[in-house]
Amino acid sequence: MEYPPDHEKWCRVREMMERHDLDAVIARAPDNVLYLTNYWTMKGYDLAIFPREGDPTLLVIEPQFREAQRTAWNKDVRFFPFYHPKDPRPPMIRAVEMAVEVLKERNLTRRVGIELSQTSQICDRMVGEPTVYWQGFYDSFRAACKETIDAAPLLAQVRMLKTPQEIERMRLANELAAIGMEHARDNSKPGMKESEVAAMIEGHIHAVGVGYKGKVEMARAFTLVWSGPGIATFTATSHRPVIENEPTLVEIWVCADGYWTDLTKNLCPRSLSAKYNVLLDQLLKIFNDAIACVREGAALGDVDRIIRRGIDAAGYPGQPSHPVGHGVGARAHEPPYSHQAAAGTMQSGMVLAIEPGIYWEGGGGLRLEDNFLVTANGCEKLCSYPDDFRR
């Protein structure tokens, strides 16, 4: 279940560093640490020092040292104390101090990139406590280095194009999402609580996903589930019942060893009602029109324009209130973003989530969402679970 070093990825990062004359990049966001080293941090306290030349250095809390040595692509893995008998400060402060020492030791203090504008990040493996930055983090590197620049947008730019290994890992996450949805489709019943459907999906994916095909070490699913009149743009899963003859909508994120899906799938106990048949047909046409525009060289904003124009023509002007296109990879939401006012074109190797939605006043509606790999001649849908869930 160990992936070989992704040399194509490292070459892309180093080409970026060459263009921006960087000695090193410091990564703390768990998704950037994963991207650069293949180590998915357990607590989010760890740091990666990625030099333009030579082996990266990974700094991890002591209990994770052996795990990091096993999974990281780089050989230089060091630990800092998670608990120190003479130092009551939080362990992430020790990580920063150690990183500064490494920069000085390796003579990497001339021009360094740090994550100055990291607005979001993947969760760590324990999920519950997202790590954050603090002023001392920035001050420490600014004091130690002659010059620091913002590496967050530079890494985001590199990450937009997936390597073959990344695509393989995203396929596994999408396969697990389909397995979870098929399990829910076959076992959901009218009257069951939305939360029961959510638990069914999340538990099944975790049970099947850990060890899946001998390739996945950790798999988790995160869902929001709404049924019938409970369907809205974004609200919490509740104890509302699954409604017969109406869709139960599942916003489903699956993470397989740090690579994500962002999907919206549906199921319906029994046959779909007449009004929902009409809505589904409308939304499928809008969805397919948007998918048809996805190919290398197309404007990123086309997805947004086509979806909103189609929803307006269907009689729902101004909908939806949420974005309808974005990148997916080591985060469920990452650049590029498909926005009608934004520049940029689609490129082969991008993976885009496309998600049109129509919502009724007072409750109810429908959303479809899949992840698509952009190719020279079109795109490939990564999840096999059908969008026309009547079949």
Which role fits each region the language model picked out?
Residues 1-391:
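Active-site neighborhoods and metal-handling regions in enzymes and metal-associated proteins
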